[in-house]
Amino acid sequence: MTATDGGPGGSPAKRPVAGDGTSIRPMDVDLSTRYLGLSLASPIVAAASPLTGDADGLRRLGDAGVGAVVLPSLFEEDMLAEDVGLAAGLEEGSRVFHEAREYFPDLAAEKGVADRYLGNLERAKGLLEAPVIASLNATSRGGWTRYAKLLGRAGADALELNVYFVAADASRNAADIEAEQLELMSAVCREAGVAVAVKLSPFYTAMANFASAVASAGAKGLVLFNRFYQPDVDLDNMTVLPRVSLSRSADLGLPLRWTAILRPILPEDVSLGLTSGVHTGHDIAKAVAVGADVVMMASELLAEGPGRVQALESALREWLAEHGYGSVSDLRGSVSAASVENPEAFERANYTKTLRSLERLGR
């Protein structure tokens, strides 16, 4: 038996109801999902944040029933900064023996930042039954393939490659930048030994094409989208300030659109994680409906605490049961671009309609 529910742009989407005509109880709704080949008890994943880098935060997230956690990133900049002191001391020798310069940074970093990260990974694995996803924040290939392999061997259930890059160099074109990033992704996916998800920014020239290329490079998942921290200006001191702002539900629209568009384009075995703007049970339901396998949450958990996971799962169960869904799998992709009568609703079809709605607000 099926019923219909309104989709984007008024397009009906199929909605399953209990086959025997009985209502579904919230407690019977199955929230389990699969992400990067891993079995998760919940679609709620704790995104990288101070909570996932702290033993008490990890313990509380585990007690709340989170589906998985992403550890704070191992940053290329941290390892390079740690190398500076010793590198300066060997500068003269490096000029004579250039090969020493190539090997030295990785060796120095491995004794510091990387070792500490591996210790944090081991601690997280000991505290949690849920999968633990390590995170690499890279800007160049460098030694990242080796660190990806180390993290996989150290027990990470999967890796998230966070490619944070602002294309501010006018001498470089989009094709060259994308080719360089794809080479990095391919190398990491090839050497990691575990499934790799790539966390993308929304600023690629042709997102659908690039996302497909990332999957072809070996990524088993995409996370949409990387939340850039935007600078601000201090007018009193005429300086640039870093600003960290938490997301809001209003930020959900962009990742919703692209998850809906990419779900039917990407291979079925490529997972999709949606992040930025997920704060309520309804937000989670929307993300799953357009095709997300999981939602990544940081802002809401930082603001409300890890215990918020239980309230969100309860709200999601209630919504699913009320609308006749016995599991998140039943809902997944029911409002993707391939499932609605008017897929252009995710592109431009409602553009003029939206502008007219703004005109009414001004009257």
Q: Which ranges hold each PLM region?
A:
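N-terminal capping/small domains of soluble enzymes
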Residues: 22-131, 138-145, 319, 362-363
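Alpha/beta enzyme core
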Residues: 59-64, 126-127, 139-273, 281-286, ...
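Short gly/pro/ser/thr-enriched loop/turn and capping motifs at secondary-structure boundaries
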Residues: 76-80, 165-169, 229-232, 301-305
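C-terminal helical cap(s) of enzyme catalytic domains, especially alpha/beta-barrels
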Residues: 81-94, 233-247, 302-323
